[in-house]
Every structure is written in C-alpha cells, then in structure tokens.
Amino acid sequence: MLFAPLQPYATHALQVDATHTLYVEESGNPDGIPVLFVHGGPGGGTEAWHRQFFDPQRYRIVLFDQRGCGRSTPHASLVDNTTWHLVDDMERIRVHLAIDAWAVFGGSWGSTLALTYAQTHPARVLGLVLRGIFLLRKAEIDWFYQQGSSWIFPDAWEAFEAAIPADERGDYVGAYYRRLTSDDPKVRLAAARAWSRWEGATSKLIPTADAAARFGESAFAEAFARIECHYF
C-alpha cells in the first residue's frame, strides 16, 4: 500500500566533495521518526512516489539522489563514485540534517547500500526495511546480464544482446562498459539506452509503459547505465 502523494517541505543541494553535489529532500512530519530512503540502480535516482512508502504523519522522510544520478551533479559522473563514497555521503546527509539516528529503507541496490551503511554505522540506525534484496554477488550479476533472466524475457534479451558483437558476448558487462565509457557520445548513448531498456523491461514480471518510457529517456539512461555498469 502506498500513501497519498505529497511534496517535500525542504530541499538541499549538499556539496560532499570538490566534485559532487547531492540533491536531498525532506517530506512528511518534520518532528516525526527520521527515515532515509535509499534508491536502487546504482544510478536509478529517486522519484516522487518513493515518498509514498511512508506515513507522512509519522515519519520525517529523507530522499537523496546518489552521486551522478537524478538531480545530483555532475550528471553521470563516475569520478569518486564507489560504495564507500555513498556510505560516507549518507553520514554527511545525517549530520547536515541534525539527525541522531534514523531508520533506513532500501530496495534492490538500495538494500545492498543500506546494509553496508548499517554495518558501518550501527549506532546511527534505528532499524532496516529491505525489499527486493540484491547483494551484488557475481552469481546475481551473471544471472541478470549473462544467462538466466534471458530465458524469462527472451524478446527483451534479443535487443540487449544485439548491441554487442558476437565475439564480445562472453562478457556483456565488460562489453557494455567499454561503450558506456567511450569518447564518442553517440556510442555511449546507444549503449546506455540498450542497457537501460533491458532493465526497464525486466524490473517487473509484467512491464509497464511508464517504466519503458522512463528507462528509455536519454538523460536517465546515460546516468543509470554508466553508473550501474561501473559498479557491476
């Protein structure tokens, strides 16, 4: 169940180092239980409906876009963009908002990052809510990008593999990474769209038109695909 749509009561542009500035927002009850929403991807960014997981009367809802994605800048940057940088960013956000401890809510890649943060800063975590758990293990990556999910979504897989020559298909992640970091913007964008559309087509058992449109949008796809492939 999702709660009714709501708007943030505060937004922040938090500079976390010489390169990156993060988009951070607060919604719900300023005096409520603090909860941090950790989005997926990596590179997925936050959306307005993510606020709706939480009762706005009870929770002080904090959303942020991780390095390089969403409304954070610079767009699609891979510079100093690692798990440990993101964990440090979460702490910087907590301190900036003067929160002593908060609940942490994450799904997919967000569950990986939430767990890592909780293990690193246990005294700052009131509790964890994890959904769609993904732990960035090689077996999970291989199943999704090499062989496994292709059997469930064969039509979408055809488009994903068509972007890569046959002699490079032994390592799709590596092949896509070379294209996503190419000096040629046309090569980068074509690879980004193919990578992103594959995820959009497979993120739900029954894909939706809204998801397909979002994952195919150029700016979203470039950040999402570059950052996700960089981590994988």
Q: Which residues are covered by each model-predicted region?
A:
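An accessory alpha-helical subdomain
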Residues: 165, 171-203, 212-213
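Conserved hydrolase catalytic core segment
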Residues: 100-139
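A catalytic-pocket lid/entrance helix-loop region that shapes and gates access to the active site
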Residues: 123-176, 231
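Alpha/beta-hydrolase fold catalytic core
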Residues: 193-232
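N-terminal cap/lid segment of alpha/beta-hydrolase-fold proteins
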Residues: 1-26, 228
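Conserved HGGG/HGGXW glycine-rich cap/lid loop of the alpha/beta-hydrolase fold
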Residues: 16-74
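Short glycine-enriched, charge-decorated loop/helix-capping segments at active-site entrances
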Residues: 75-81, 145-146
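Conserved acidic catalytic loop of the alpha/beta-hydrolase fold
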Residues: 84-102
